[in-house]
Regions:
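Conserved short alpha-helical segments that host acidic/polar catalytic motifs at enzyme active sites
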Residues: 1-164
Length: 164
């Protein structure tokens, strides 16, 4: 089962997110990642394997700073165990992590492709990020409500919008 953590505050997010993911290791996982927003851009670090490997990559990533972020440990349900399939996933203004299964993700991916969205992963999570991004007009809550109407399955999201 996946582990999800989010943080916003006055402290730097990267260490807090990785520490939180370490606390969720007992849940089992095959990959891990974090996204951190510094107010102007979102940076992502992800890896297959253990949170300890993620921590090493985070510590080696220059300019990874920000007080808002999300983190995820993944247990693969769609797509193989690869860094590309690890969460978080980004589409435009939307950075998303997810637990659950989106049953109609293939149909949504096909529809989104006609609108110019192309997935690079094999995950239902990236399709959800693309869907939310396609519906986003500056109001995060409206985009999420509309996306929820289109999504079929059981799921939970943690989402960051680049401009909020």
């Amino acid at each position: 089962m996946c582990g999800i953590i989010g943080f916003t505050g006055n402290l730097q997010a990267p260490g807090i997110l990785v520490d939180g993911l370490q606390q969720l290791e007992y849940r089992g996982y095959d990959s891990a990642g974090i996204a951190v927003n510094n107010g102007s851009e979102t940076k992502i670090v992800k890896t297959t394997g253990k949170v300890a490997t993620l921590r090493e990559k985070v510590e080696a990533t220059a300019d990874l700073a920000g007080t808002c972020g999300i983190g995820h440990t993944r247990w693969a349900t769609h797509g193989g165990v690869t860094e590309v399939n690890a969460h978080p996933h980004v589409s435009g203004n939307v950075t998303l992590i997810h637990n659950g299964i989106i049953e109609n993700y293939k149909e949504l991916a096909a529809s989104l492709k006609t609108k110019g969205f192309t997935a690079i992963s094999e995950t239902d999570t990236e399709v959800a990020a693309m869907l939310i991004d396609s519906l986003y007009d500056g109001d995060p809550f409206a985009a999420l409500k509309e996306a929820d109407k289109a999504l079929e399955g059981a799921y939970g999201f943690c989402v960051m919008f680049k401009d909020h």
